Amino acid sequence: IRLKKDRFELDELARAVAVTKAGFDDIIRALPRAVGHRRGERVIEGAFRAVAREEGNGEGYETIAASGNHANTLHWIDNDGEVREGDLVLVDAGVEVDSLYTADITRTLPVNGRFTEVQARVYQAVLDACEAALARANQPGCRFKDVHDAAMGVIAARLHEWGILPVTPEESLASEGQQHRRWMPHGTSHHLGLDVHDCAKARSELYQGALLEPGMVFTIEPGLYFRADDMLIPEEYRGIGVRIEDDVVVNSDGSVTRISEDIPRTVADVEAWIARVQAG
């Protein structure tokens, strides 16, 4: 029953996403203060928590506010690091509304408002993976696991283009390969609802192997993670971690659309968003 949401549930999830957007706006307002604080990541976490508590029941899960190399720790929840000019900050956060339905959104923001060339290159690769996953979800006969496979096709191709992947994309994508998973080690999607990882214990044939059906709500969240101490990659990539996560719904006609479409995510739109919010 929980795998497919009814109208009430869909409305609550949309409300959770809308309040989460407000929380991200306050994160952007807090970025200058975060830069000057010895625990700037907690300034970001606190800004989001205030909105979650004031406008909802609270945070749907522990906020990840990961600046710089901390973004390369997938569930960085200590949030005790500095936030430095020129770095990216990866924020994975969601508001749980009073009905207990939660959003789950990730945005990777340039702390000073502008991406560097290499940051934008990595970011665009992740965004392209998001778009490929959404496009596959909109094709007839798509199974849940196909969404991940589509995203990984882009990730493997970009890693190969940059000279990072030690094999061809086809070899990496084969079950006996998977070399790309060094830099993208997690799944692309999970169901969303009362739990941030909704229906996590569902049988495989009802989850990964299931056809997408109207009422399903899930995330699309590929990433690329280049640790600062990774000697297998060019130096310019080291310390950069990017994830982009949206919440999507399968509509009654079978199309899949982003519930979180109002939260900017392209390079240009993110930069404009930061400038607009900080201008007041």
Question: Where are each of the predicted segments found?
Answer:
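Active-site neighborhoods and metal-handling regions in enzymes and metal-associated proteins
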Residues: 1-280
